[in-house]
C-alpha cells in the first residue's frame, strides 16, 4: 500500500496491477492503489454510487428547468469522460475540467447551440441548487473535493500513467498526490493525446520537468504504419520531439476511399 499507480483508464490500471501481482507474487489486496484517479477519489472520500449524479438526475433536472439534458452514463473505465449533446452541460463540465468559469468557457465559443449567457448563468444556478437539494456530486466534483480534503495517502512511489489524457483538474489532483510522495514517475505520449475534446490538457504533460526517459522501441507498430504515422505527427508544432523504431515486420497499409468498404 506504499505504491500508487494511477491511470486515465481502468484497463491500464488493472493491467499494471495484474503484471505486478505476477512478477512479485502479490495478491490484489496487496495493491489497493492501482486504479484511476476518479476511483481513488471515490474510495478515499467514502462516496457511494447513489451520491453521484446519474442519467435519471439530469433527466429530472431537465424536466424541472425545461432543458433537454441529454446525457450518456460515464463509461466503465472510470475515466470521468462526460458525453452529452447538451451544450449547457458540456460548457459547465468543460469549465470545471479546465479550471475556468462557465462564462469564460462560453466565450471560447466551442458550443454549437443557440445559448445566451443569461441562460447559462441560470442553468449553473439551477444545477448547483439541484445537487445541493439532493446531496449529489458529479464525477468532476469528486476531483475537486479530493484536493480540498487532503485525503491522499502517503506513498513511497507513485506512477501516473496515460498522463497525456489528464485534464487540468486531474493534474491538480495528481500533484496533490505526488506532493506527499518520495518518488514520482509520469508516463505518457503526447502523440497519443486524443481527448482534448473531453478536456484533456496535453500541454501540462509537455511542460513537465524532471529526468526524461524515452522508450525508443515499439513492439506493436510495423514499419509501414510507423512511416505514415511519422509523416502525419511531425506536422504538429506543439509536441515533444522523439525518435522511435518500429518492430521488424514490414506490415501492410491499405487505403480506402469509401467508408462503406
What are these regions, as identified by a protein language model?
Residues 2, 71-159, 168-173, 186, ...:
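Accessory N-terminal region flanking or inserted into the helicase ATPase core
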Residues 40-88, 92:
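A basic- and aromatic-enriched beta-loop-alpha substructure that forms the phosphate/nucleotide-
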Residues 1, 20, 61-65, 142, ...:
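Alpha-helix C-terminal capping segments
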Residues 39-42, 144, 227-230:
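Generic alpha-helical structural context detector
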Residues 8-11, 35, 157, 164-251, ...:
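Conserved helicase motor core of SF1/SF2 NTP-dependent helicases
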Residues 30-31, 36, 55-64, 114-128, ...:
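SF2 helicase/translocase NTPase motor core
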Residues 1-50:
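P-loop NTPase Walker
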Residues 23, 40, 47, 95-98, ...:
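Phosphate/oxyanion-binding loops and surfaces in catalytic or ligand/nucleic-acid-binding neighborhoods
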